[in-house]
Amino acid sequence: MKTDRKAERSGIVGAAASPMQARGREGEERAAAHLAAQGVRILARNRHCRGGELDLVGLHGDMLVFVEVRMRANPRFGGAAASITAEKRRRVILAAQWWLAGEGRRHAHRPCRFDVVLLEGPATTPPTWLQAAFDAD
């Protein structure tokens, strides 16, 4: 089944998705629920720009948090944390700058951090939330 990328970017529910995309969406839902239970208010999900994307954007107290969600069913090849490369960090930072210049403009005065939520193993395994996992420097 082909993915309707435009519908997916616009957040239209029910957009055709591959099994991998559906699994990714489920993982992001798990991550968002975990963060919400820890007091994070989710402001945005799945925002795309040329050169990058944001899985989740939230407020944790007064801190603006850009969250990368990484899933791995199997710990081979280093697990979910090992998949956060320098290039991936660069793309998340680029997308955060884009978001702050547009949709998130009203939050541009807030301090920011880059977090990662790791989902490893079966769906019953609790997520691991790495706060301040990397910097924009």
From Swiss-Prot:
Coiled-coil region(s): none
Family annotation (InterPro entries): Restrct_endonuc-II-like (IPR011335), tRNA_endonuc-like_dom_sf (IPR011856), UPF0102_YraN-like (IPR003509)
GO MF annotation, one: nucleic acid binding
Pfam family, one: UPF0102
Family that this chain belongs to: Belongs to the UPF0102 family.
HAMAP family: UPF0102
The protein's name: UPF0102 protein azo0871
Organism of origin: Azoarcus sp. (strain BH72)
